[in-house]
């Protein structure tokens, strides 16, 4: 019997099932290792990014510290995103009467501004308004300009203004505030007129005053009519407020002087605001009795009489008509936070709060004014000076004025409660800005 030789076992060789299991295990381990490695790599990248940001932040902080110490920055390139540049403010457009708001603006101080005149160089400024000549010690109030938010308000150009007035009459009509605007206008124009004999002339009277410039055949006039309608105090100015009687439906005695003017500039407000009810009559002053009306009721009647006269007598093709809004008074220092103050006395700086409104302008009267003007057939431009005057508590004549025709004395100045005038304005001063608005509209 032949025996077959025995088979030899090969070392290290495993059964196929074992091999397959081992290979599968190795593959799974490889996958797990790869995922772990990827995770470790991502963490490392995140840490690296954070470190980069920290490094950049530290670099910026060091640079800021160096800059604040007035030292040059290190020569390193900062790894930060560029800052977004702030766009420059939009350029203001040239003044356009229909698109520009004269009430949206602010007062800016400019000590370098050259004054076109002073109360010493212009011989026509009344003593009542000559603050510097009357001894006012400060002058900052002279160097503020009204800037519009969106538009450029042009400077008053006296030569250009005279060209506009060549062969024409401009007449200012109203009360003592309007008289101040007229004087300001005259002084602005006069700054461009030579002081040669016959080049100009001035005639003053209680009712009508006329400044003429011969070369331009231009006439700049003022007519006194504080209520616009007729009253028993038109000529008797010294008559007390309680004794005034208005003829609310009569105006022709005044109106006959306004005809044939090329430009009419009206104002009427402060004389209505005495605190008294307005004694009003219809028909002749000789009639017995009168009716006492609230100021705003009488004001509406008077303005309607004026509006009817304008609509009946003014040709819009040949005459421009303007109406000045309320010139603000400053009678309550509490309005602007000056507790214990005496009205505008010793105020040397404007109120800078945007849109400030105090108690010195009656809104109901303003509404009456706007309503009457809005119903007229004749185009009338309302020059809204109310907001810009609200801020100028510093620019009134205060105690540097006259009262009863006499200059306030040094002794009287020690009693500001009695002698401070916070209605009228120093000239030069705020009325020059009113005339800038007028010039811009012309």
Swiss-Prot record:
Keyword Translocase among UniProt keywords: no
Enzyme class: transferase
Main location: Golgi
Gene Ontology biological process terms in this record: cellulose biosynthetic process; pectin biosynthetic process; plant-type cell wall modification; xylan acetylation; xylan biosynthetic process
Cellular location(s): Golgi apparatus membrane
MF terms in GO: O-acetyltransferase activity; xylan O-acetyltransferase activity
Pfam families attached to this UniProt entry: PC-Esterase, PMR5N
Keyword Lipid metabolism part of the UniProt annotation: no
Membrane-related topology note: Single-pass type II membrane protein
Annotated catalytic residues: 176 (nucleophile), 421 (proton donor), 424 (proton acceptor)
Record: glycosylation sites: 96, 217, 346, 384
Domain of life: Eukaryota
Stated family: Belongs to the PC-esterase family. TBL subfamily.
Role this protein plays: Probable xylan acetyltransferase required for 2-O- and 3-O-monoacetylation of xylosyl residues in xylan. Possesses extremely low activity in vitro.
The protein's name in its UniProt record: Probable xylan O-acetyltransferase 8
Organism: Oryza sativa subsp. japonica (Rice)
Organism lineage: Eukaryota, Viridiplantae, Streptophyta, Embryophyta, Tracheophyta
Gene for this chain: XOAT8
């Amino acid at each position: 019997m032949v025996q077959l030789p025995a088979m030899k076992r090969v070392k290290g060789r495993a059964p196929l099932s074992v091999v397959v299991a081992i290979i599968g295990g190795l593959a799974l381990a490889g996958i797990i290792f790869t995922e772990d490695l990827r995770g470790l790599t991502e963490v490392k990248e995140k840490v690296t990014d954070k470190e980069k940001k920290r490094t950049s932040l530290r670099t910026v902080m060091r640079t800021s510290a160096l800059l604040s110490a007035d030292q040059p920055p290190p020569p390193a390139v900062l790894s930060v995103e560029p800052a977004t540049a702030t766009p420059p403010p939009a350029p203001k457009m040239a003044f356009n009467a229909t698109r520009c708001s004269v009430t949206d603006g602010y007062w800016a101080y400019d000590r370098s501004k050259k004054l076109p005149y002073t109360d010493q160089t212009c011989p026509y400024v009344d003593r009542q308004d000559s603050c510097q000549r009357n001894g006012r010690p400060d002058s900052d109030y002279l160097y503020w300009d009204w800037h519009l938010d969106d538009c450029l308000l042009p400077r008053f150009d006296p030569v250009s203004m005279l060209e506009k007035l060549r062969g024409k009459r401009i007449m200012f009509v109203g009360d003592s505030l309007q008289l101040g605007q007229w004087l300001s206008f005259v002084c602005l124009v006069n700054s461009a007129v030579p002081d040669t004999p016959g080049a100009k002339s001035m005639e003053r009277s209680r009712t009508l005053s006329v400044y003429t410039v011969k070369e331009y055949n231009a006439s700049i006039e003022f007519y006194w009519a504080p209520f616009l309608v007729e009253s028993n105090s038109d000529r008797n100015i010294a008559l007390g407020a309680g004794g005034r009687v208005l003829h609310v439906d009569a105006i022709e005695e005044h109106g006959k002087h306004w005809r044939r003017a090329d430009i009419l500039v009206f104002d009427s407000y402060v004389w209505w605001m005495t605190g008294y009810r307005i004694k009003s009559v219809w028909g002749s002053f000789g009639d017995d009795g009168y009716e006492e009306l609230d100021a705003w009721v009488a004001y509406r009647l008077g303005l309607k009489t004026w509006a009817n006269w304008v609509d009946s007598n003014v040709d819009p093709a040949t005459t421009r008509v303007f109406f000045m809004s309320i010139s603000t008074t400053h009678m309550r220092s509490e309005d602007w936070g000056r507790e214990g103050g005496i009205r505008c006395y010793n105020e040397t700086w404007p109120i800078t709060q945007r849109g400030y409104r105090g108690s010195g302008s009656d809104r109901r009267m303003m509404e009456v004014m706007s309503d009457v003007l809005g119903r007229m057939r004749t185009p009338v431009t309302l020059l809204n000076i109310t907001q810009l005057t609200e801020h100028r508590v510093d620019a009134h004549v205060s105690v540097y004025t006259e009262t009863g025709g006499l200059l306030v004395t040094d002794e009287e100045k020690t009693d500001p409660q009695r002698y401070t005038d916070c209605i009228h304005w120093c000239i030069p001063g705020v009325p020059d800005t009113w005339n800038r608005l007028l010039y811009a509209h012309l």
